[in-house]
Amino acid sequence: MKTFSLKPADVEKKWVIIDAEGLVVGRLASIVAMRLRGKHKPQYTPHVDCGDNVIVINADKVKFTGRKYDQKVYYHHTGYPGGIKERSAKFILEGRFPERVVEKAVERMLPRGPLFRKILGNLRVYKGSEHPHAAQQPETLDVAALNRKNVSA
């Protein structure tokens, strides 16, 4: 029997919507990353973009466990000598673009390379409950029901 390898033309992409309200960031991100790569499908092929299009709504209402809300620090570098900057998770979530917490968590769970950039384009994160993708008829994925640890108390 030959090994099956999925061709890009044979990929069936679905649209999935996830409500992130009250969900733990890391657990949500690992489920989203798996869906984006397509590892939940039996015909998964590592070098082909066979994952789904994922919409995450209410990204501003995600939760951190423990004291990470106050203590977790996100770093970025300006490119200049001594230009390392840091922001806390609390600062970002209460700021102008709270969806970046979820975007960064998912981004850092995906392998790097040309396929990474293509896969990341299938992720759409919105801070409110409104999204412009109703025409795609996304099906709802209830992450909270998958495991009781996915929801923060």
Curated annotation (Swiss-Prot):
HAMAP family attached to this UniProt entry: Ribosomal_uL13
NCBIfam families: rplM_bact
Gene3D superfamilies (alphabetical): Ribosomal protein L13 (3.90.1180.10)
Protein name: Large ribosomal subunit protein uL13
SUPFAM superfamilies: Ribosomal protein L13 (SSF52161)
Keywords: Ribonucleoprotein, Ribosomal protein
InterPro entries assigned: Ribosomal_uL13 (IPR005822), Ribosomal_uL13_bac-type (IPR005823), Ribosomal_uL13_sf (IPR036899)
GO molecular function: mRNA binding; structural constituent of ribosome
Function statement: This protein is one of the early assembly proteins of the 50S ribosomal subunit, although it is not seen to bind rRNA by itself. It is important during the early stages of 50S assembly.
GO BP, sorted A to Z: negative regulation of translation; translation
Family listed: Belongs to the universal ribosomal protein uL13 family.
Subunit structure, interactors included: Part of the 50S ribosomal subunit.
Organism: Methylobacterium nodulans (strain LMG 21967 / CNCM I-2342 / ORS 2060)
Lineage of origin: Bacteria, Pseudomonadati, Pseudomonadota, Alphaproteobacteria, Hyphomicrobiales
PANTHER family the UniProt entry points to: LARGE RIBOSOMAL SUBUNIT PROTEIN UL13M, RIBOSOMAL PROTEIN L13
Positions of transmembrane segments: none
Domain of life (superkingdom): Bacteria
Any single Gene Ontology cellular-component annotation: cytosolic large ribosomal subunit
